[in-house]
Amino acid sequence: MKNIKSLLLAALVGLSSTSCNDFLELEPLNDIVLENFWTDKSDVESVLLGAYSALESSDCLLRMVIWGEMRSDNMTESNSSPEAIQQICRENLLITNDYCKYNKFYDVINRANTVLHFAPIVADKDPNYLWIELKANEAEAVALRCLCYWYLIRAFHDVPYV
């Protein structure tokens, strides 16, 4: 019994002494850790380019045309148009219609908000990140965010503002 208690005590001491060591906290090999990312102006520009890339995805571009031009008199539906597009042309926006999902626009808005949050922090860290570049990047992020909200409000009127 005395040996079992000694063994358990040794195991407990051994586990408690290694549980707080830094060697157990591994950084992921295939992901970028947030603390290591926002260090220079190229990080800000890459996230901003990601926002542009998300905006020019087929999901966003198609919805821009469908929500704008197809609902106006500039384009008309045809008999061969899918039912979902015919519903939009008749201004029948249903939650079951895949073309009425606006999550891709919020992806762009999220990226723009991320740039607006972290760009000033990067400007404090990186001496090569000029004030004029910071303001230009912030202006681009605001413009992207405004464009997305313009399409969302034009099509759906009341949308969440984040």
Locate the predicted segments by residue.
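Conserved, well-structured interaction surfaces
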Residues: 45, 49, 53-57, 81-156
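Active-site segment of extracytoplasmic enzymes that catalyze sulfate/phosphate-ester chemistry
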Residues: 72-84
